[in-house]
From Swiss-Prot:
Catalyzes the hydrolysis of N-succinyl-L,L-diaminopimelic acid (SDAP), forming succinate and LL-2,6-diaminopimelate (DAP), an intermediate involved in the bacterial biosynthesis of lysine and meso-diaminopimelic acid, an essential component of bacterial cell walls. The gene is dapE. Homodimer. GO terms for biological process: diaminopimelate biosynthetic process; L-arginine biosynthetic process; lysine biosynthetic process via diaminopimelate. The active site is at D75, E140. Pfam families: M20_dimer, Peptidase_M20. This is Succinyl-diaminopimelate desuccinylase. Zn(2+) 2 binds at D106, E141, H366. Transmembrane segments: none annotated. Pathway: Amino-acid biosynthesis; L-lysine biosynthesis via DAP pathway; LL-2,6-diaminopimelate from (S)-tetrahydrodipicolinate (succinylase route): step 3/3. It comes from Agrobacterium fabrum (strain C58 / ATCC 33970). It catalyses: N-succinyl-(2S,6S)-2,6-diaminopimelate + H2O = (2S,6S)-2,6-diaminopimelate + succinate. Binds 2 Zn(2+) or Co(2+) ions per subunit.
Length: 398
């Protein structure tokens, strides 16, 4: 295999059926690509009770600073109905100028391109004046417990430090060069349970319908808006994601009702201040009687999900200007600096070094017939290669 060819790199990666949390041969393949370039490659198995064991990879070229990290994941989401695919999901077939396969854009394509980019850099200039590392997990599409966070802890414990990181997630909405992600909103989830009294639907006075109380509470969580956005972030937004009574009968008032919610929040809040605001709203709504006239206040219980994701924003000029300049040089486009979208493993990396995200076009990620334009693989490789040159020149003060 020619390591400098992103198309060949990606085809080989797609053919590894690494549906989370399976390694599927993808990390072994990366080992064979990176070791000949001089990278010291280590495989790290992470474990935690109640979760699948996950294998991860850390590879470093060089021993001195400045130190640039590329981060990503080789695990992919399930393919769904394989019969619905026009090309087998692990075939890496090319048709109409596009390569088909699960993980093509999310995010084996980004990994394939950065491998090609550093291989080209070494071929032209030799090893960088500093260090480059790959931090690759097999647990990004899963619970994200035995992946990037534990790999970072492991690496930091052995003395690894980094000056900047690029995560190769598919950040572009429409065309390559559209967008760099320089931050992410936080994410907080919880589950509310309201206890009632079960009874016959024809005799509501003999029961206490918990759905009425739950509606009061969830309405208070969605109205009014938590904020109207900030200079760098969209407005915080709460969505009720499940409602359940455990009751299939239409003539029975249920004994309890439960609702789960998720809020994506901006830098107006922390997870702690947001929890306090949610409790304040729930307590106020519990005492209202619009949906429960002549009833006692709603009794509710709230359970918070573990590990909220905290909001972050990167303002590192060397990192952002080097990447933005590389994109403009290669594509002629000035990328938008954005904080939109969901969470990513950048939320873990931001505690160790400045981090941004840039990869392929994400229109088909997680979909049937996930695919990438072959031409985009070459373009992204050129962007990454130019970025590597610019970042090390900037970091060295040249």
């Amino acid at each position: 295999m020619t390591t400098t060819d992103p198309v060949a790199n990606l085809a080989a990666l797609i053919r590894c059926p690494s549906v989370t949390p399976a390694e599927g041969g993808a990390l072994s393949l990366l080992d064979t690509l990176l070791s000949p370039l001089g990278f010291a490659v280590e495989r790290v198995m992470a474990t935690e009770d109640g979760t699948p064991d996950v294998e991860n990879l850390y590879a470093r070229l060089g021993t001195e600073g400045p130190h640039l990290m590329f981060a990503g994941h080789t695990d992919v989401v399930p393919v769904g109905d394989e019969a619905a695919w026009s090309h087998p999901p692990f075939s890496a077939d090319i048709a109409g100028g596009e390569m088909y396969g699960r993980g093509a854009v999310d995010m084996k394509g980004g990994i394939a391109c950065f491998v090609a980019a550093i291989a080209r850099h070494i071929g032209k200039h030799g090893k960088p004046q500093g260090s480059v590392s790959f931090l690759i997990t097999g647990d990004e599409e899963g619970p994200s417990i035995n992946g990037t966070s534990k790999l970072l802890e492991w690496a930091a414990a052995k003395g690894e430090t980094w000056d900047a990181c690029v995560v190769g997630e598919p950040t572009n909405p429409d065309q390559l060069g559209d967008m760099i992600k320089i931050g992410r909103r936080g994410s907080l989830s919880g589950r509310i349970t309201v206890q009632g009294v079960q009874g016959h639907a024809a005799y509501p006075h003999l029961a206490d319908n918990p759905i009425r109380g739950l509606l009061q509470l969830t309405h208070a969580l969605m109205h009014p808006a938590f904020d109207h956005g900030t200079d760098d972030f969209q407005p915080s937004n709460l969505e009720v994601t499940t409602v359940d009574t455990g009751n299939a009968a239409t003539n029975v008032i249920p004994a309890r009702a439960t609702a789960a919610f998720n809020i994506r929040f901006n830098d107006s809040w922390t997870a702690e201040s947001l929890r306090a605001e949610i409790i304040r709203r729930l307590d106020a709504a519990a005492n209202e009687g619009e949906l429960r006239p002549d009833r006692a206040p709603v009794k509710y219980e709230i359970v918070w999900a573990d590990r909220p994701s905290h909001v972050f924003l990167t303002r590192n000029n060397a990192l952002i200007s080097s990447l933005s300049g590389a994109i403009e040089t290669v594509t002629g486009k000035e990328p938008k600096l954005s904080t939109t979208g969901g969470t990513s493993d950048a939320r873990f990396i931001k505690d160790y070094c400045p981090v941004v995200e840039f990869g392929l076009v994400g229109q088909t990620m997680h979909m049937v017939d996930e695919r990438v334009a072959v031409a985009d693989l070459e373009t992204l490789t050129r962007i990454y290669e130019t970025f590597i040159e610019r970042w090390f020149a900037h970091a060295d003060g040249k």
